[in-house]
From Swiss-Prot:
EC number: 1.18.6.1
Cofactor binding mode and count: Binds 1 [4Fe-4S] cluster per dimer.
Gene name in the database record: nifH
Organism from which the protein derives: Rhizobium leguminosarum
Taxonomic lineage from the root: Bacteria, Pseudomonadati, Pseudomonadota, Alphaproteobacteria, Hyphomicrobiales
Binding site residues for ATP: 11-18
Name of this chain's protein: Nitrogenase iron protein
Length: 47
């Protein structure tokens, strides 16, 4: 089984974390990265 990969995006609300994570995933698929288990975490900074 392939090793688990993790990517995290952090920043203030409204900065585009969800868009960035979706674009990153689309780029990986577009570049034919082999299927690997992956966790994408999206978090915000506390005010």
């Amino acid at each position: 089984m392939a090793a688990l990969r993790q990517i995290a995006f952090y920043g203030k609300g409204g900065i585009g974390k969800s868009t960035t994570s979706q674009n990153t995933l689309a780029a990986l698929v577009d570049h034919h990265v082999p299927r690997i288990p992956m966790i994408i975490r999206i978090g915000g900074y506390a005010q």
